């Protein structure tokens, strides 16, 4: 099926190109999203008549996307999720999740603009792409953690393994301190016993 592109489409072509695509791809994606029209003589003629207007509109939306991209690109967003002690999520972080946290922070992002190359199924820092325009793409960082405190530690560069090791070391230190306190108290009791016995003998 032949269509004429109304904007640049990755791996297909530039605005105004007539390209061959699968009918399903055209009907389910290109046509309903206004990215292309069927390449009939009437549509091609209409495009040529509106080409200058379409190019101007595309340039305007590109500038808007670039302005947003300068603010959005490189931002880190916290996603709170339940996970096992080993850091495996009970579920996964989706493009909708990424769009939602960005929107909550004041950025207008739709889940259809987000691409996550590898499924996010573990705690930690993960990269997502945000395609703001056919020619404008930025990356954001998703800080997936079990709590805001954990997210803050991860943001400082500590991995889940390092955090777990620190927690284990802290727990072992507390146990060691507890045993030291118990041992010290026992020694004091043993030291007091002879003195008490001596006092008792003197009083007789």
Swiss-Prot record:
One of its GO terms (cellular component) is ribonucleoprotein complex. Residues 180-204 are annotated as: Disordered. One of its GO terms (biological process) is translation. Disulfide bonds: none annotated. The keyword Membrane does not apply. Signal peptide: none annotated. Residues 187-204 have a biased composition (Acidic residues). PROSITE patterns: RIBOSOMAL_L9. GO terms for molecular function: rRNA binding; structural constituent of ribosome. Belongs to the bacterial ribosomal protein bL9 family. This is Large ribosomal subunit protein bL9. It comes from Ruegeria sp. (strain TM1040) (Silicibacter sp.).
